[in-house]
Amino acid sequence: MKTLTRNAYAKVNLALDVLRRREDGYHDVCMIMQNLSLYDTLTFTVEEADTLTIALACDKAFVPCDARNLIYKAIALMGETYHLTGHVHVELVKRIPVEAGMAGGSTDCAAAFHATRELYGLDVSDQELMKLGVKLGADVPYCIMAKTALSEGIGEVLTEVAPLPDCFVVVAKPTISVSTKMVYENLHANELQHHPDVAGMVDALKQGDLSGVASRMENVLETVTTKLYPQIEEIKQTMKESGAENAIMSGSGPTVFGLYTEKATAEQAAEKIRQQYGLSEVYVTQPC
């Protein structure tokens, strides 16, 4: 029997631009992706067996633990691709908010790819894992890479960039559910009046210029979500009024995050948001 434990880190989009809708229904995007210190923990156990079987357990009852789960799908895809056998059991401790725009499912999926490779001693590169990962989700290749990156194409074309300078990141998930599909269907990329300065952000990251990064934070999907869910804009404004360098929505939402230079200021802002909006999923994190 072999056992392995991995942490799977949340991500936010420091910038998110949508360039066009493709004929295959996906959208070409241009994003800056950053990992945060908020993470799920996955413990994998493999026992010998003649065929591949997968069992998944989670500490949160609302998380599906069957073939719908991306962890399950990743192990099954690895098994099919590399002809693996054995009974794989996974224990998931879930801390990243679900359906939050923070790649919680994708990062767990990436952890499953990495763990399966290690447990079975497979001579498989990260690039090969990323090619498999994109079959399961556009954010999965980034989560396999797990470094600050410029993300293009549908999210699978990745270029490592300098990480976000030291700061504190307050993350707040409103108690609303946002459909990514609905957001993209209601976005008219060709009619957008403004686009994020992604190239400028890459330069600011290279220079370690936190204020330069913050001033370029922008997410074009907010043009859809803030009209439907005003609380997203309200939380952004509360973060800014509470000392954030800037605050935007991550991914397709509804999570909002803000950058702070001081831990005490970040913690005070987090507590204010918990109290003012009655939210339980509010965290003070750091880039990682």
What are these regions (language model features)?
Residues 2-7, 15-17, 21-31, 122-246, ...:
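ATP-dependent small-molecule kinase catalytic core of the GHMP/sugar-kinase superfamily
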Residues 50-64, 112, 207-217:
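Short, basic/glycine-rich phosphate-binding loops at helix/coil junctions
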Residues 76, 80, 114, 118, ...:
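Short, well-ordered alpha-helices that flank and scaffold nucleotide-derived cofactor binding pockets
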Residues 42, 71, 90, 112, ...:
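Hydrophobic packing within well-folded, soluble alpha/beta domains
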Residues 91-120, 138, 245-260:
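Glycine/serine-rich anion-binding loops at beta->alpha junctions
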